[in-house]
Amino acid sequence: RDKIIYMDLKPGESLSDKILAEQLEMSRTPVREALIRLSAYNMVVLKPQSGTLVAPIDAEQLEIEQFSRLTMEKEIIKLACQNQTPELKWVYESNLRAYELGSKNDDPEKIRHLHEIDNNFHGLAFAATGKIKSYLHMHSYMQHIERLRVLTLMMKADNNINSDHTTIANAIVVGIERLAVETLEKHL
């Protein structure tokens, strides 16, 4: 999954369960089972007789995932604005600092690191409202949007990520629901 999300395996690339099994030092059966699970998320295309391919990023699936994500996050942000805690400000500040420092880093793992920090940011409001399981569930089926987000980070196409996060976090911490939601809508 991660190799597809982080573009180590690119859309259209052919996959061999035999080669994957050798690379992962395991038998072919668990590799085949993993490929079947990935096909259920439209991340790979299983073609009997001709092999397996990394699926392209699907525009229709992106739209579904984006709608689901925006709908859930807006509601969670509204709840977070109503239930601020003193700790929440510190947690958001820590995340924002980590993203800022990570964005200045030239580490080869920079994209993975920034993506993880970004995901953590979006999970904070869920955690603050006691809805972390909802976040984990949502995140588990957001495969195509994750791939697009990684591509965006790779192309440095969105330099406003931390700025948007700062506005959202500050609005949540002081309970300005409208600003938090409007910024989230623009951000996503």
Regions found by a protein language model. Give the residues of each.
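Unusually extended, aromatic-enriched hydrophobic runs near protein termini
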Residues: 1-13, 27-30, 40, 162-188
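Short linear motifs at protein or domain termini
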Residues: 1-82
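Conserved amphipathic alpha-helical segments that form helical-bundle/coiled-coil interaction surfaces
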Residues: 65, 77, 84-150, 162-174, ...
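Loop-to-transmembrane-helix entry motif
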Residues: 152-155
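Active-site loop of classical SDR/Rossmann-like NAD(P)-dependent oxidoreductases
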Residues: 157-159
